[in-house]
Amino acid sequence: MSGIPEITAYPLPTAQQLPANLARWSLEPRRAVLLVHDMQRYFLRPLPESLRAGLVANAARLRRWCVEQGVQIAYTAQPGSMTEEQRGLLKDFWGPGMRASPADREVVEELAPGPDDWLLTKWRYSAFFHSDLLQRMRAAGRDQLVLCGVYAHVGVLISTVDAYSNDIQPFLVADAIADFSEAHHRMALEYAASRCAMVVTTDEVLE
């Protein structure tokens, strides 16, 4: 069956549970962009309340810190009501997807975009696909990407790999992302830490 599966609640990882990082990068606000990845009502609706609450709270803490520190903020959001051509192979794995109505498409209220934030239309797993995210980052002289949102092993991880492939240092915030299961979440963290990113917690970013 295609689409988002039923999700059972699980605890978000703590700093002690993170995989070891191979990279030793340091986050610098003047170099960074925060990517709020697909935090739309449609994608958060399947999350159990305890998981949703922790995810949104940590993402909101990140966003507030980024505003204070001068970190550029970017959002991805699917347009909804895609045509067959626009949907492409996505429909074979995820079905028709969301509608274009605000009930599906809006970013959740706690993370509402501000007037200076970049709004990117999301067409495939990677935030960089058919968007000008890379061009905007290059023009702004920013070469670090902090990632939060859903789903960890799908769009979040692929966007992380794409950033790395473009020599942008990704920082994957382990307790500000969520997934279909704890096992999927762990898989994304282990791959990122060993292959393409720094895996950190919200508290570590805010230190």
Swiss-Prot record:
One Pfam family matching this protein: Isochorismatase
Database matches in CDD domains: isochorismatase (cd01013)
EC class of the enzyme, as a word: hydrolase
Keywords of the record: Antibiotic biosynthesis, Hydrolase, Virulence
Keyword set includes Magnesium: no
PANTHER family hit by this protein: ENTEROBACTIN SYNTHASE COMPONENT B, PEROXYUREIDOACRYLATE/UREIDOACRYLATE AMIDOHYDROLASE-RELATED
Chemical reaction(s) catalysed: (2S)-2-amino-4-deoxychorismate + H2O = (5S,6S)-6-amino-5-hydroxycyclohexa-1,3-diene-1-carboxyate + pyruvate
Domain of life: Bacteria
Active site: 38 (proton donor)
Similarity comment text for this entry: Belongs to the isochorismatase family.
Membrane-spanning ranges: none
Enzyme nomenclature, EC number: 3.3.2.15
Protein name per Swiss-Prot or TrEMBL: Phenazine biosynthesis protein PhzD2
Involved pathway(s): Antibiotic biosynthesis; phenazine biosynthesis
Effect of residue 38 to A: Loss of hydrolase activity
Stimuli inducing this protein: In liquid cultures (aerobic), phz2 operon is induced by quinolone signal via 2-heptyl-3-hydroxy-4-quinolone (PQS). In biofilm (microaerobic), phz2 operon is induced by quinolone signal via 4-hydroxy-2-heptylquinoline (HHQ), a precursor of PQS.
Source organism (scientific name): Pseudomonas aeruginosa (strain ATCC 15692 / DSM 22644 / CIP 104116 / JCM 14847 / LMG 12228 / 1C / PRS 101 / PAO1)
GO biological process: phenazine biosynthetic process
